[in-house]
Design a protein with these regions (language model features):
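Short S/T/G/P-rich N-terminal loop/turn motif that feeds into the first structured element of a domain
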Residues: 1-52, 61-69, 84-117
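Glycine-rich, flexible loop/turn motifs
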Residues: 81
Length: 117
């Protein structure tokens, strides 16, 4: 399970969402081809207008570090800080446990007992 997950919470400045989405979209191909990249998803906050959460999953933290320092990503970081971001927070985590509705091997025993699985 040793993947590394990066959570990028960003609040985009008023009137800058289209620019931010265009800029982040321009990274898609580079991201897809980055060493160790597994997948990414973006979610929009229901509570805070203009706030997004991007979650990317990587093979390990070394791959995250390489992406962080990739030239086009660095340029996008600077552009975002200077133009698009009102605020942001980055959290890097490794999973404690992961299970699904079907694969319950790592699920807590009390949950499996309650669900009778």
């Amino acid at each position: 399970m040793g993947n590394t997950i990066v959570l990028f919470e960003v609040t985009v400045k008023n009137g800058r969402m289209d620019d931010y989405l265009k800029m982040s979209g321009s990274l898609k191909e580079s991201l897809a081809n980055a060493e160790g990249f597994i997948r990414a998803e973006r979610f929009s906050s229901l509570a805070t207008e203009g706030k997004l959460l991007s979650m990317s999953v990587w093979e390990n933290e070394e791959c995250v570090s390489k992406w962080r320092n990739f030239a086009v990503h660095r340029m996008a970081q600077k552009h975002g800080r200077m133009n698009d971001f009102a605020d942001y927070k980055i959290t890097v985590v490794t999973p404690v446990r992961s299970y699904t509705m079907i694969d319950r091997a790592a699920a807590p025993a009390d949950s499996n007992a309650y669900l009778e699985v």
